[in-house]
Amino acid sequence: MLINEEKERREKLNYIKKHGYNFPNDFKPKNNFSDLTQRYKDYTRDQLFSLKICVSVAGRMTNKRIMGKSSFFILKDFEGEIQLYIQENLFALNFYKQFVKKWDLGDILGAKGKLFKTRTGELSIHCTEIKLLTKALKPLPSKFHGLSDQETRYRQRYLDLISNRTLCSIFKIRSLIFINIRKYMLKKKFLEVETPMMQNIPGGASARPFITHHNTLEIDLYLRISPELYLKRLIVGGFNKIFEINKSFRNEGISTRHNPEFTMMEVYMAYSNYHDMMNFTEKLLMFLVKEIVGNSQVKHGTNIIDFKKKFFRCTLKEAILKYNPSIRLSDLNDEVKMNKIVKKLGINVKKKLNAGQLILEIFNKTVEKKLIQPTFILDYPVEVSPLSRRSDVNKNVVDRFELFISGYEIGNGFSELNDADDQKKRFLMQCKLSHNINNLNKISSFDKHILYDSDYITALEYGLPPTSGLGIGIDRLTMLLTNQKSIRDVIFFPILKPSV
């Protein structure tokens, strides 16, 4: 049936071309449907008739009713829809019969005419000019009721956008998030910068990178897993307040919260610490919610998230003890006991974990999903935070926070480690833990996803001022502000396996 409909559409296209119709390329719509609807929704039929308001619109036809010598079409654009009224006697001889009647759902039309309201009060355009701008050769899905197959929605996002206005609003909100972040950052005197997407050494996070090859230089390069080390080089160079919004890439698993290509915002502020950055993060998110949602509350799933109150703060160990009454503080200082706890929780551990990694596993398994209201978790173990400054109070933890909302991580920040010697030791320790290698000269034998960035150490040796940093996942933030459960629903074209 679909093949027959496509065949009919091609026959109509051939007929239109054969009879000398040229598809215009110079039609310029002056009005959009949403603005027209908002502006004239309260006008009466008599008011519109007397005003004789002329408009010019374009969009995709999504419905039609042909009634002899007149027709009603529904046109849709990104933000709304409007009805067209076409009468045969207003157009050239045979134009209505030969062409207008052969137009199909999905065709893109341009129209000019006067606004009026039908007897039922529907705002419409009485057309004095109408043109077929593009002929759709394939029919719209399910007679324009939308796509039901989830995979098809992701693979053919253009069809999903055509048939799903809610989806359009999600991506409009995503765009507003970018706009309002930049608005806030510029107001706070931050400079937006760009750092390399392809790097000689993929640093700033522990993740497996995508590898590419530069033919002229004959070297392997890596799509960045994080911009962090380059941004901190800029702080060394004298830029005190910077941010970047851009893509990062990690050659790892795909889930409802992870896409290999994702959008991050990173912020760095000299002469500040992680407490300052927590305060900054809190104010930024409060601003975004107010600007985008219109109030201080956000619905996500069954949860109502309140952004009006000051965000709750507690340490990693305090959070574990709060949600695990059977665990004692002394247990979290004993690797043997923590290994037993991890095993009891059913956590699949493929390699030996150190104390910091064990604590993090327990937290991820038992606490993270319970953090519904905005919560800063503080003081992470030094073993899982190689770029963070050690705490002045407890050298086993670092001045780091992660922000959790509605059960998942939204942001990560810390006081930056600016001790070059300590950073060098941490880099080497990270390599040793991953590969059981003690000799720096064997760096060529390391897996290519963990390498030692000697130039970054050199930069630190020139002096990094006391600095705090922040990373926010824009995709997850969009999920939160649009009430979506999957990261794929807030990315236009998520990564998928090729279809068979």
From Swiss-Prot:
Cofactor: Mg(2+)
GO molecular function: ATP binding; lysine-tRNA ligase activity; magnesium ion binding; tRNA binding
Keywords of this entry: Aminoacyl-tRNA synthetase, ATP-binding, Cytoplasm, Ligase, Magnesium, Metal-binding, Nucleotide-binding, Protein biosynthesis
Top-level enzyme category: ligase
Keyword DNA-binding attributed: no
Cofactor remark: Binds 3 Mg(2+) ions per subunit.
Any Pfam family matching the protein: tRNA_anti-codon
One GO term of the biological process aspect: lysyl-tRNA aminoacylation
UniProt catalytic activity: tRNA(Lys) + L-lysine + ATP = L-lysyl-tRNA(Lys) + AMP + diphosphate
Recorded superkingdom: Bacteria
InterPro entries according to UniProt: Aa-tRNA-synt_II, aa-tRNA-synth_II, aa-tRNA-synth_II/BPL/LPL, Lys-tRNA-ligase_II, Lys-tRNA-ligase_II_N, Lys-tRNA-synth_II_C, NA-bd_OB-fold, NA-bd_OB_tRNA
GO CC field: cytosol
Major site of localization recorded for this protein: cytoplasm
EC number of the protein: 6.1.1.6
Family note: Belongs to the class-II aminoacyl-tRNA synthetase family.
Matching PANTHER family: LYSINE--TRNA LIGASE, CHLOROPLASTIC_MITOCHONDRIAL, LYSYL-TRNA SYNTHETASE
Protein name: Lysine--tRNA ligase
Species annotation: Buchnera aphidicola subsp. Baizongia pistaciae (strain Bp)
Gene that this polypeptide is encoded by: lysS
